[in-house]
Amino acid sequence: YFTDHYAEVVTSTIHRDWNNPAVIMWSLGNEVRTNLTLGDYSSSEIVNVCTTVNSAVKALDATRPTTMGNNAPGGNLSALMAIVDVVGINYNGNNQTYQTDRPIYGSETTSALSSRGVYALDSENMAYPSYDNKAVSWGNTAAETVNAYLSSERSCGHFVWTGFDYIGEPTEWNKYPAKSSYFGIVDTCGFPKDIYFMYQSMWDSRPMIHILPHWTHESGNIDVWLYSNCASVELFLNGTSLGKKALSQRGTKNQYAYTVAYAAGTIVANGYDASGNLIAQDIQYTAGTPAKLALSSDKTAVNTASDDLVYITCDVLDKNGTLCPTASNSVTFTVVGGTIIGTDNGHGANVEKLSGSRHAAFSGKCLCVVKHDGASGAMKITATANGLTAGTISVTKGETTIAATAPA
């Protein structure tokens, strides 16, 4: 099939996208030795195939460099490296071992495993800890990957596998009921996992600090990690300082680590600038029992002339409004003035119907996706659960013009 159709595919792809400014390189393929069941990366067969495809791309667009993703631990990539303009390596550390005069980058990296809001391996429920300490055998933790590429003088950077969890490849469980991946920086609902904040601390210049885990436990010593881009951080438990740490003391995993004897109450992380001014703060409270549901929306108004969807987040809260981080209450959604498209909770081993109106919360949260009915007025979404106060939210509907804005 490939031999018969590659020219057609290359032509249609480039003609479709060559005016798209987001396209910076053309890739000849990913892990082509595996996907085409060819020989070793140094074989004449695979070199000839890639040379032919590269020539086809260059004939259509010589203005952009070509690249490809290669997975060849210990393999001979010199012949393939000579074909493309920019060399992509899947996994394999920081690429220091590959000899080439071409630009080099991580075309697929990491494959770290985590479940949002879980802080110990839970084999019964097929959930991985949200501490950045688990990866597949061929991959690395997120922090290991970031550190490798930051320390490399040769690499242009790396692409992470993956931004989002996705349905399929529930590595390493690989059996029912696990049905989606655990690789994501965010889960299938789009809810950030803790590792999201590690990346934020590395790449965002806006002051930030993030505590993990939550602060609702039974007892024991708790490993507390802080992700922050501030010059120094300080952790407090119930008003008592547990010590200040400077940026130079940041661990190799891109976080500040404390071991804290658990006591119910409040844990606070402060971030300071170089002059000692407080510029960022995160707080975790000990939660009580679930008491109510609270809804929030990704938008306050929806254009009825569009096919826009509205994403409704449901949080399970205690009577004081604190998120109950281990809550798993079954939540039922209803909507007036619209239609439920689906529900989810982001857990890779949850097999409730995604197109249904009911979902159990996972780590205190679940999601409902709704679509307007085309009429003006308001769309009202309600969430109910046994024994809890219902949550409601309204989204305005109408033919509105949404002004385009530049990213912040």
Question: Which residues make up each language-model segment?
Answer:
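Extended substrate-binding grooves/exosites of carbohydrate-active enzymes
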Residues: 1-249, 255-278
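Beta-strand-rich structural segments
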Residues: 224-228, 270-271, 307-325, 331, ...
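Extracellular Ig-like/FN3 beta-sandwich strand-entry sites
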Residues: 262-266, 307-309, 376-378
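Short, hydrophobic beta-strand segments
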Residues: 256-262, 355-374
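Short aromatic-acidic-glycine turn motif
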Residues: 246-247, 290-295, 334-350, 401-406
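Edge beta-strands of extracellular beta-sandwich domains
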Residues: 276-288, 389-399
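Short, solvent-exposed loop/linker segments at the N-terminal edge
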Residues: 215-220, 301-310
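Short flexible loop/turn segments that cap and initiate beta-strands
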Residues: 229, 235-242, 281-283, 309, ...
